[in-house]
Amino acid sequence: WDGGREKAPAAMCRKAIMADEGGEIEVWGDGKQTRSFLFIDECVESVWRLMKSEFNEPVNIGSEEMISINDFAQMAIDISGKDVKIKNVDVPQIGVRGRNSDNTLYEKNIGWAPNQKLRVGMEKTYKWIETQVNNGEN
């Protein structure tokens, strides 16, 4: 969550927490890249269910809720309750333009799929990172 090398959920939360009221947070690229994020509790649940099953083929596990990086940054800002703007920073393209999970095979064979809304997971992540920042931990 610290140091600038974290993944997008932690980075967006950290940036929103550390942003000054009326300030801005940087988002690399145009922010139109899309991703889906899976909260750790559901990742663990998915792996546990897979391990208990008889299914033994490669399978995707992820959220099917896709969001643009700009909308994701705005979600972190909204959770913060601050008036903060997004500043898109022009950088060479990093990674793929869009990425999402298809849980059809997993759900068909395991009978379950992650279903926690992204906002709920982000609120939990935000709260944890905010505590770390406020305690000066890194």
Regions found by a protein language model. Give the residues of each.
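Flexible, glycine-rich beta-alpha linker
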Residues: 1-13, 34
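C-terminal substrate-binding subdomain of Rossmann-fold SDR/epimerase-dehydratase oxidoreductases
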Residues: 18-138
